[in-house]
Amino acid sequence: MGFQADPINMFRGLPYLPRDHKALQSPPLYEVLALGPRPGSGGGYHRPMFSYRHAFHAGNHADVLKHLVLIATLRHLTQKPTPLMAVDTHAGAGVYRLDGDQAETSGEAQDGIVKLTAAGLADPAPALADYLEVVASFNRAGRPRLYPGSPFVIQKLLRAEARDKLKLFEMHPTDIKALVGHMAQLEAGRQVSVARQDGFESLKALLPPPQRRALVLIDPSYEIKSDYTKVSACIQDSLKRFATGTYLVWYPLIPRPEAHDLPRRLKTLANQAGKPWLHATLSVGQREEAPQAQMPGDAPHRPGLTASGMFVINPPHTLKPVLAAALPQLLQVLGRGRGKGQTLESGG
């Protein structure tokens, strides 16, 4: 089993704080995280590909779906005693504050993990209960103030005794600095490696893995259209290099042709390779609110992301039944109004 997070002491000596910082005596984790420049602090970036910051979106409904699927998949893969290599091609900062400026500016976590935790489901589906327990392990009792990103989720579930490995890639200049610092506090040693490299390209050198077992999470920001074609090209190349790996692709369901074409393309690639696949989507729908009057010159109201999907190639045979039980409960709690729904299909 991976590192067991202690929300009081796990970040003792965080490198972003001075060594004599008072919080180091008994620091709540949420008080010592350093996640880079705040909005308006002058820490801007000159390249468009670096405009996306996941800290604004951490813990939203898309993260809930992604990590629900990720945890359920890892639980199955780690039942075998043989080593596993896990890869996150777009790792982000690793862990996020839900009470920080970025999360509070967007408010997206309120309609995701915060709402789900507050719902207090009497009989949550096993996969949903497992997900909530993983998030809770990084927090004090009550409302979550920290949200573990995929690197923290994966590392927590990997096993030191089995010599599982985790490879993390991130290109954002601020997020990679935060990621290195955050992962160092887990004291995972050689189990985890972090690199400021293009995850799409770097994955090629890792396949096939010496362990002969791999889980690969691919979740770029999709802020540029080429990300969609890069994802499908990455899957096509990866299946040629290592056809038996388990590949998880997250994508946003937005009114863009590339977004709707991506799952169709992934189905085709899986079918051509003769591999099974699973496709899950969650749409929380539009808010049922009275429209607000706009003044002349105001920017049009944008509802934000309301739906996303997870596409899994070579899914565990246990994944579909556990999601079939969990997704309706997710929709029950997180669904907001017109357009809400969930789907689950498989093939191969």
Sequence positions of predicted segments:
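Class I S-adenosyl-L-methionine-dependent methyltransferase catalytic core
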Residues: G44-G348
